[in-house]
Amino acid sequence: LSDNLSHLEKLGLNLVIEGTTPEAVDEASDRQRFEDFAERCQLDMPRGMTAIDSEGVRKAVSSIGYPVLIRPSYVLGGRGMEILSNDKQLDAYMDEAFLSPDRPLLIDEYLGNAIELDVDAVCDGEEVLIGAIMEHLEEAGIHSGDSTCFIPPQNISEGVLSKVEEWTTTIGLELGIRGCYNIQFAIRDEELYVCLLYTSYAADEEDS
C-alpha cells in the first residue's frame, strides 16, 4: 500500500490523500526506519534483524540466538509468522520462504514467558484516543486471530499500563498517524517492548 501511494505522489497528480500519509505508513512499515523511530522516541523493541537471502537469515538467527520470531515484511495480518527453536525448524521454514530485496524476512528475538497486549487506537494528528487494551491469554507470539483476549487487562500493573498508554500516544503523534492503528506490545519482568505496529487506511494492513 505505501509503495502504491508513494508512486501516486511521484506522478504529481495533485491528489489529496486523506488520512495517514504514505511517508508515515512507510516509516511504520519499514523495519530499519521504525527501529530508528523507536530509538529516537526511547521505545524498547526486541532485538531484530532483516534478511533478503538464506545466508542473511541464518546469520541473523545465529546472531540473535534461538528462539526467534520470523515473519515476512509488508504482509497482511501476520501471515507466515513462526516461532523457531532450532535449526531443523529453520530449515523447514526456509524451504517454503520466498526472499528478495523487496520481500525481506524479519527475524526477532522471541520473548519467552512474556505477556502480549493488543492496543487499538485512533489519532487525528493532535490527540490520541485509545479504544481498547487487550491482554492475550496465550503467551506472546500467538497470532491475534488465534488468541483469546481479556478486556480490561487482568494481570498488568498500573505502572505498565500507564507506560502502554504513554507509548501508544507517542507513536500516534510522533508518526503523524491520522486514523486507526494497532500496536502489539510484549511485557516480560515488568519491562515493556513494542513488537508490531499496524497503520494504514485499514488499521491492519501494514506492519513494522
Each language-model region and where it sits:
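Single conserved hydrophobic/aromatic residue that forms the stacking wall/gate
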Residues: Y198-S208
